[in-house]
Amino acid sequence: MDIEIIRKTDPEIAEVILKELNRQRNKIELIASENFVSRAVMEAMGTPLTNKYAEGYPGRRYYGGCEYVDMAEELARERLKKLFGAEHANVQPHSGAQANMAAYFALLKPGDTVLGMDLAHGGHLTHGSKVNFSGQIYNFVSYGVREDTGYIDYDQVEDLAKKHKPKLIVAGASAYPRIIDFKKFREIADKVGAYLMVDMAHIAGLVAAGLHPNPVPYADVVTTTTHKTLRGPRGGAILCKQEHAKAIDKALFPGTQGGPLMHIIAAKAVCFKEALSDEFKEYQKRIVENAKALANALMERGINLVSGGTDNHLMLLDLRNTGITGKELETRLDEVNITCNKNAIPFDPLGPNVTSGVRLGTPAVTTRGMKPEDMVEIADIIANMIKDENYKEKAKERVAKLLEKYPLYPDLL
């Protein structure tokens, strides 16, 4: 990236870019849905491919001059299919939400009944929230987790499925720290004649590395983002069985999108190539190791976690016994250069703008090179900030010392 070219044309935006780079370098990033892309992925996003309109699909475009962007999209599709063992892939979704929209449009009619995970229990806006298109176009019925364990209540899922006879069951979450049993979801779907869709946006990297069960053999359709644990550009993708390929492709284009972002698709292809490597698998193992180390260290310091730990890259702090809200802790940690997000916990007595929880994740800190012993240090800082707001200056010092060991993009700007 040549900041000087940007600065000559638009010094204000150049300044914003530099400030954001500085923020990323000088804060511990614990937002579970964020990560730092490789330089190769970053560079692929800023190429002449951004100039090309390419409505349609490779070999079936509505514009001329697409022979080379066709090659980029074919590489992305083939690599994605190989990565997850899928029959068909669509790499055009601009986001995970648009991937989900296309999947719904392909499988459902307005008003159809769908079973999805409650947002307050770890689901996602696009899994039936009333403020989202999904909850407005379709009749969503929500399932959740058991209050005593924090694990998905599969008995409840089956009971609701038998009662409501949904056309589609959606599995997947944005704040669920445990392994999801896709085989069990498939069995429930088959009992009521429903399609099964899995949104694996958060866990795609773990699935690719074999650290979480792969939903592809069980689901009719699988959607994902390409960032988060997959560590690619911001965007989405859809995998499906061949029998749904035509409907999925048509639902995305011309159904819900026009021209694809070919520079982003090229960056997705780079990301998928990286994800097929042995190095990526080792990286995913370190994400989980770090998450378990952070979770255990927090619990050792008296911090409760929803479900009592984690199997993946994230955890949910239950702050109900601490006297501090999720909103307050998010602010406190940001003041000492630790970035996280307040998050509702299951059966939360507080509203979504305050919350009784905070969500933490380890993909970004693992990308920086941090290790389990660093997670213990971070847990200790967080525990002290929960208990004592006056610990701020000491916490800042400890954060700065930790970040010094792991520079971010040292050769950039």
From Swiss-Prot:
UniProt site positions, description: Plays an important role in substrate specificity: 227
UniProt keyword Cytoplasm, yes or no: yes
Annotated pathway: One-carbon metabolism; tetrahydrofolate interconversion; Amino-acid biosynthesis; glycine biosynthesis; glycine from L-serine: step 1/1
UniProt entry keywords in alphabetical sequence: Amino-acid biosynthesis, Cytoplasm, One-carbon metabolism, Pyridoxal phosphate, Transferase
GO molecular function annotation: glycine hydroxymethyltransferase activity; pyridoxal phosphate binding
Any Gene Ontology biological process: tetrahydrofolate interconversion
Entry keyword annotation includes Cell wall biogenesis/degradation: no
Gene Ontology cellular-component annotations: cytosol
Subcellular compartments: Cytoplasm
Gene3D superfamilies named in the record: Aspartate Aminotransferase, domain 1, Type I PLP-dependent aspartate aminotransferase-like (Major domain)
Modification type N6-(pyridoxal phosphate)lysine: residues: 228
Enzymatic reactions: (6R)-5,10-methylene-5,6,7,8-tetrahydrofolate + glycine + H2O = (6S)-5,6,7,8-tetrahydrofolate + L-serine
EC category: transferase
Chain positions recorded as (6S)-5,6,7,8-tetrahydrofolate binding sites: 119, 123-125
Short name of one Pfam family: SHMT
Protein family per UniProt: Belongs to the SHMT family.
Subunit structure: Homodimer.
Function as written in the Swiss-Prot or TrEMBL entry: Catalyzes the reversible interconversion of serine and glycine with tetrahydrofolate (THF) serving as the one-carbon carrier. This reaction serves as the major source of one-carbon groups required for the biosynthesis of purines, thymidylate, methionine, and other important biomolecules. Also exhibits THF-independent aldolase activity toward beta-hydroxyamino acids, producing glycine and aldehydes, via a retro-aldol mechanism.
Name of the molecule in the record: Serine hydroxymethyltransferase
Source organism phylogeny: Bacteria, Bacillati, Bacillota, Clostridia, Thermoanaerobacterales
